[in-house]
Every structure is written in structure tokens, then in C-alpha cells.
Amino acid sequence: MLDQTLTSEALVTTVTHAQTHQPVQRPLRDSVQQALRNYLAQLNGQDVAELYDMVLSEVEAPMLDIIMQYTRGNQTRAAIMMGINRGTLRKKLKKYGMN
């Protein structure tokens, strides 16, 4: 089997530069950080509950969707790709209504 290691450098998003309107790629991590900064700035100092779960679901649900498409619904293959148990994958799919 071919060992395919995904590095964080491969997880990039494309955004449009505000001044030049040219597409710019940046790591997914930067996009998540910026989204969190924007979200917290809109709170104007108010407390928020369950932020961790909210952020996790915003990332996890689309990831599951794309991986299940990529594996053509093969849960065993998807679980291996994600490095999780197939039972855990099934629970996550059910949680997001993807079963």
C-alpha cells in the first residue's frame, strides 16, 4: 500500500486579496484562526458557550462529507484515511445526519 502522508502545507484554502482581488492560497489553519477572530470580534465581549463543539462541527461535518464522497461511501476506507475506528466514523456520520 502506498503511504500517503498529508502535511499541513497541503491543507490550503484560496481567498481573494482585498486590494488586488487576486486569489491567494493560505493554510487552512490561518483561515480557521481568521474566522474565529471575526466571530469573537462580533461578540463584543459577550461570553459564548460550547465554542469548541461549534468549531469542531463546522470543520468536521464538511470533512466527513468530502471524505465519504472521495471514498464513494466506503466507511472502512474513510475511517482508515481519517485514522479513526469505523465505529467512531459511523457515530460521527449519524451525528451529522449522513448515515
Swiss-Prot record:
UniProt-listed InterPro entries: Fis_DNA-bd (IPR005412), Homeodomain-like_sf (IPR009057), HTH_Fis (IPR002197), Trans_regulatory_Fis (IPR050207)
Descriptive protein name: DNA-binding protein Fis
HAMAP family linked to this entry: DNA_binding_Fis (MF_00166)
Function: Activates ribosomal RNA transcription. Plays a direct role in upstream activation of rRNA promoters.
DNA-binding feature ranges: 75-94
GO molecular function: DNA-binding transcription factor activity; sequence-specific DNA binding
Organism: Tolumonas auensis (strain DSM 9187 / NBRC 110442 / TA 4)
Family the UniProt entry places it in: Belongs to the transcriptional regulatory Fis family.
A Pfam short name: HTH_8
SUBUNIT field: Homodimer.
